[in-house]
Structures are given as C-alpha cells and as structure tokens.
Amino acid sequence: MTFPFSGAAVKRMLVTGVVLPFGLLVAAGQAQADSQWGSGKNLYDKVCGHCHKPEVGVGPVLEGRGLPEAYIKDIVRNGFRAMPAFPASYVDDESLTQVAEYLSSLPAPAAQP
C-alpha cells in the first residue's frame, strides 16, 4: 500500500495544521501579556473611572488634563492622599502607558454652570 501524499504535501499539511495554529496561540498569549487590561479605555472604565469620571465626583477629573505618563505612573504606583497605590501585579506598566495615552486623547469635560 502506498501513502497518497508526497513529502511536500505532508510538510504543507503539518505546517498548516500544527505549526501555524501553535504560532498563532503563542502570539495571542504574547499580545495578552503585553497589556493585562487590553486597552487604556478598558482600564479607565473598569478601574480609574470609578473615582475619576466627571459624573462620579470622587477623585479629580483626569480627562483632558494632559497629565504626563510619568506622573500617572508615579501616582498609581505610590498612591496620593485618598488614592491607594496599585502594584504592578494589579496594573502593569504597559496598561498605565495605554491609559495615559487614552486620557490625553480625551477632551476636557464641559464646565458646569
């Protein structure tokens, strides 16, 4: 009995069926590791916004202030007044970079009469 596929066909099937999916899985895992919160908006909505959204009125409004990334990282890591510190195990540095970029892209909230 002969095997119906040539050596080249077997290699192509192996690459397509085994190697390629494994590579995609590894790449997806790396992308997940790059930022544990996925995006700056997601982090802001799920963590920061509970105190810092304009309509909440607990912490200072961050939107449209143009706060430097280094300032945001320092406050988040060390805390300040009523704001607790958040360790890197909870909010990674890449996520802080993304939230700083997100906040700088937002306009300042409209002044209240």
UniProtKB/Swiss-Prot annotation:
The alphabetized UniProt keywords are: Electron transport, Heme, Iron, Metal-binding, Plasmid, Signal, Transport
Q: Which PROSITE patterns match?
A: CYTC
Pathway terms, separated by semicolons: Aromatic compound metabolism; p-cresol degradation
The UniProt PTM text for this protein says: Binds 1 heme c group covalently per subunit.
GO MF terms held by the record = electron transfer activity; heme binding; metal ion binding
> Signal peptide: which range, if any?
1-33
Alphabetized InterPro entries for the sequence: Cyt_c-like_dom, Cyt_c-like_dom_sf
One Pfam family assigned to this protein is Cytochrome_CBB3
Gene3D superfamilies assigned: Cytochrome c-like domain
Please identify the protein, giving its name as recorded.
4-cresol dehydrogenase [hydroxylating] cytochrome c subunit
Q: Which organism is it from?
A: Pseudomonas putida (Arthrobacter siderocapsulatus)
- Source organism lineage? Bacteria, Pseudomonadati, Pseudomonadota, Gammaproteobacteria, Pseudomonadales
